[in-house]
């Protein structure tokens, strides 16, 4: 029974990740006026599965003088946490769903940090430090935005649909900045463009020493976290959970990647600490005073 429950949770997420990767490659190809995946299966539907098989049959390499246990555990930690985060969304009667999901998602930083430290590589460690700093910086604004919404629409932090059609005009305008900040923080939290570190594609990413299933687990965790954050945005800002709304938000992720240039490290740190955090804290203080 327990195994069946775990499979019911994991299998749909894995299938959605596979379709998200296919959709991203197809949309990016359309934006760049080139052909996307179209050989494997009908319209390239089997391409994600062949990519996963290719990664699965590659030889796992353990760097010399690395911490073997931590090196193997870090991708599994990231993968498990990306799946467990869906529990807070699936349990609709929980009183503190927002806090539960934020607590689980905040633990993802440990998988990234452990990967950079256990690799015993200066490039992986430097990439890990920058990725951790990015995630922690925008996680504060993300949590403050969620708590502000929780104080505004309910007496606790339970997930309630923020239906703009049922609200007066003034609160709608008050929620719009929080919605925009939340969407930008999602991009930073999931390490997506334009908040992706440019050197991560060269030799300074936290997962530079990983191959085979370890790299695949990090890849799956990233896209699963995108789906979780899109679901939270759909619930809080778009009137409720909907697969269509999550797909639209994912398309916005891909659109952002295909159109915007990357920020430098100092630029997105300045944006997080000097712009987003003061704004979200101001909204939190305002909504708390109204609730009191």
Swiss-Prot record:
It is a multi-pass membrane protein. It comes from the Eukaryota. Keywords: Electron transport, Membrane, Mitochondrion, Mitochondrion inner membrane, NAD, Respiratory chain, Translocase, Transmembrane, Transmembrane helix, Transport, Ubiquinone. It is found in: Mitochondrion inner membrane. InterPro entries: NADH_UbQ_OxRdtase_su1/FPO (IPR001694), NADH_UbQ_OxRdtase_su1_CS (IPR018086). The chain crosses the membrane at residues 2-22, 71-91, 98-118, 132-152, 167-187, 213-233, 235-255, 272-292. Its main location: mitochondrion. One of its GO terms (molecular function) is NADH dehydrogenase (ubiquinone) activity. Pfam families: NADHdh. It is an enzyme of class 7 (translocase). It catalyses: a ubiquinone + NADH + 5 H(+)(in) = a ubiquinol + NAD(+) + 4 H(+)(out). PANTHER family: NADH DEHYDROGENASE SUBUNIT 1, NADH-UBIQUINONE OXIDOREDUCTASE CHAIN 1. Core subunit of the mitochondrial membrane respiratory chain NADH dehydrogenase (Complex I) that is believed to belong to the minimal assembly required for catalysis. Complex I functions in the transfer of electrons from NADH to the respiratory chain. The immediate electron acceptor for the enzyme is believed to be ubiquinone. This is NADH-ubiquinone oxidoreductase chain 1. It comes from Chlamydomonas reinhardtii (Chlamydomonas smithii). The gene is ND1.
